[in-house]
Design a protein with these regions (language model features):
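DUTPase catalytic domain/fold
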Residues: 1-117
């Protein structure tokens, strides 16, 4: 178990990257995608119906994102969030500007009771 600013987290495998601050003055931690070879990701079509996970395999640490799709990208982390608290996910402006990617709901909220592998 590791700790980051009083928030404990667990890695689901050894290759998962720790949350890091990009600079000493960064207000938040950066998270990285965890896309092991031969894994799959959940893909949602434009109408938010779930598509078979087997249809979108990870190849060479990459996953294809088609127009009007939403994809859950795993971090490989499990956060030990205290009851009554949450982890907030914010999109990086550079990710949207340079790659056209952002969070579907603009801010992601992970409640203390949420665990998904």
């Amino acid at each position: 178990m590791r700790m980051t600013s009083n928030l404990y987290f667990y890695k689901i495998h050894s290759e998962v990257k720790d949350p890091v601050r990009a600079t000493e003055g960064s207000a938040c931690f950066d998270l990285h995608a965890s896309l092991p070879q031969f894994s799959a990701v959940k893909v949602y079509e434009n109408n938010f119906e779930e598509v078979d996970k087997r249809d979108r395999k990870v190849v060479d640490g990459r996953v294809q994102v088609n127009p009007n799709e939403r994809i859950l990208i795993p971090t490989g982390l499990i956060f030990d969030i205290p009851v009554g608290h949450s982890v907030r996910l914010y999109p990086r402006s550079s990710l949207a500007l340079k790659n056209g990617l952002t969070l579907a709901n603009n801010i992601g909220i992970i409640d203390s009771y949420w665990i998904d592998f």
